[in-house]
Amino acid sequence: LISKTIFSNFFMNIKILVAAHKQCEMPKSDVYLPVQVGKALHPDLDLGYQPDNEGENISEKNPYYSELTAIYWAWKNLKADYIGLVHYRRYLGMKHGKDKWQCLLTKEEAQALCKEHDIILPQKRRYYIESLWSHYEHTHDISHLEKTKAIIAKDYPEYLPAFNEVMKRTWGHMFNMFIMKKSYADEYCAWLFDILFKVEKQIDFSSLPAFDARLFGRISELLLDVWIETNGYSHKEIKMIQMGNENWPQIGRAHV
């Protein structure tokens, strides 16, 4: 039994993308794949990471889609059994300790989790006094979320009940962080980007400051739970490990 488990894990190809726009320390394990996001906009900047502008991509949309340009690249170009997304400042992990780099999810831990659960997520982020909808309304342009809801109601009505329920909550699985089977990620990306591209056609970006322009990374944060719950996938929560100090006043929030 032990040898069979080891054998099956050996052939479980997991790639966890680490979205980054600048040079920074990276995990040493080959389960992690650093991805330079927005490479198309900075062709002379070579971080030595996988660029997000190879093959079919939306790299030039990074100012609006943030880390989603990495997951789009993986959806269209990466061959793996499981894929995940973390950030150069935020990782997933299961251990506690002073050295955060020693607490990051290992390949073996990721393999064990993926064998038992459909999707791996960071622990819920709680807002306590605000719902997800009201928090967005108070920090961003709520018309963007209203347009998203209208598109879901028209094109994906089976997702509307979960959308309405999720928006009432004071918590959610944020930061677009996950690990899931590639076939699930393919389903998710096809659904997610179809919605976001339709919202994009209804937005005038000319007057939006850079911080507010990153709206698709924020909208997608709220849609992940909608997709998971509508499809009935199981999930396992593990720790989110923050590298450095989070800038709370700005946590409206700025994506990579």
Indicate where each model-derived feature is located.
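Short, Lys/Arg-enriched N-terminal segments with co-localized hydrophobic residues
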Residues: L1-F11
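ER/Golgi luminal nucleotide-sugar-dependent glycosyltransferases, focusing on the catalytic module
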Residues: F11-R253
